């Protein structure tokens, strides 16, 4: 079977670029799209017409008097009912499922007050059951549900095909991606939570690409991700996963890695729990056993 033509590929690239620009600006004129995309007015009109016909974009007449004898200009915006996605968070102290539309409006959300994730297959099925309920209760067109993203707590590099090892969750080489996709019939993207958070910061243009940025997510444990020269460096790559194992010289707290003083146990939520509960520094529980204690503490 032959590959797609270059023209087809270019149309996909241009449609994707237009959707990103419209999403970033909220509402934007065709003239601005010509300026940003470097295309002619006719080219912009063809691409926008395709996206309007598929229900992804809405066209709104600009306010004010039109210039000259031509028709009044129009702005383009995302159609709130054009597409939907699911977002799933799995950390020691936060486990939730959220359904949003393409304009970032939350249509439904469920937070698990306390969930035992010791059995990953059972836990993932619980997330999927809630996702099915949110989809049904929202009344959305299931065919417009594009996919889902999972942000989970880990300091390890994610394995190929969405396999996850997470000391914080107590998971070892779990096929998270395939389990979710089989249960929901949707494409999934699996990310370390620190990287997912950094992507959101970059998308919102809160990160200066020229300077570079390292994001450190400090919860029960500690995760990190970086953005340099237009590239994301995920948790577990180039030593980023080891930030949590930088050692405090005056700390006697024993880390799961066998060393003492690691930030993972001496500078995170685990340290707060240890202090509140009076646990000895050489007998801290593993992370996967801490979520219930943390939930009770923050109530």
Regions from the language model: what does each represent?
Residues 70-109, 214-230:
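Gly/Thr-rich phosphate-binding beta-strand-loop-beta motif of the actin/hexokinase/Hsp70
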Residues 59-85, 188-213:
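Conserved phosphate-binding catalytic cores of ATP/NTP-utilizing and phosphoryl-transfer enzymes
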Residues 210-266:
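Glycine-rich phosphate-binding loop of actin/hexokinase-like ATP-binding domains
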Residues 106-212:
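Glycine-rich phosphate-binding loop and adjoining helix at the ATP-binding site
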């Amino acid at each position: 079977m032959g590959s797609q033509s270059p023209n087809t590929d270019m149309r996909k690239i241009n449609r994707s670029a237009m959707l990103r620009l419209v999403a970033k600006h909220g509402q934007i004129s065709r003239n601005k799209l010509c300026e940003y995309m470097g295309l002619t007015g006719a080219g912009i009109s063809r691409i926008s017409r395709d996206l309007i016909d598929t229900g992804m974009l809405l066209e709104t007449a600009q306010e004010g008097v039109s210039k000259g004898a031509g028709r009044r200009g129009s702005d383009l915006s995302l159609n709130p009912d054009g597409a939907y996605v699911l977002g799933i968070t799995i950390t020691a102290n936060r486990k939730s499922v959220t359904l949003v539309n393409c304009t970032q409006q939350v249509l439904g959300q469920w937070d698990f007050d306390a969930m035992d994730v010791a059995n990953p297959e059972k836990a993932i099925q619980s997330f999927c059951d809630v996702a099915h309920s949110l989809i049904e209760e929202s009344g959305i067109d299931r065919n417009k549900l594009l996919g889902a993203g999972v942000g989970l707590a880990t300091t390890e590099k994610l394995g190929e095909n969405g396999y996850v090892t997470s000391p914080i969750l107590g998971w070892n080489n779990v096929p998270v991606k395939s389990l979710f996709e089989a249960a929901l019939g949707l494409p999934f993207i699996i990310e370390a939570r620190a990287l997912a958070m950094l992507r959101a910061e970059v998308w919102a243009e809160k990160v200066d690409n020229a300077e570079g940025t390292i994001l450190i997510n400090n919860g029960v444990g500690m995760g990190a991700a970086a953005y340099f020269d237009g590239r994301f460096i995920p948790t577990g790559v180039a030593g980023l996963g080891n930030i949590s194992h930088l050692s405090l010289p005056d700390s006697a707290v024993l880390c799961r890695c066998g060393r003492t003083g690691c930030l993972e146990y001496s500078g995170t939520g685990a340290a707060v729990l240890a202090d509140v509960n009076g646990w000895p520094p050489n007998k801290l529980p593993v992370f996967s056993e801490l979520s219930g204690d943390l939930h009770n503490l923050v109530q």
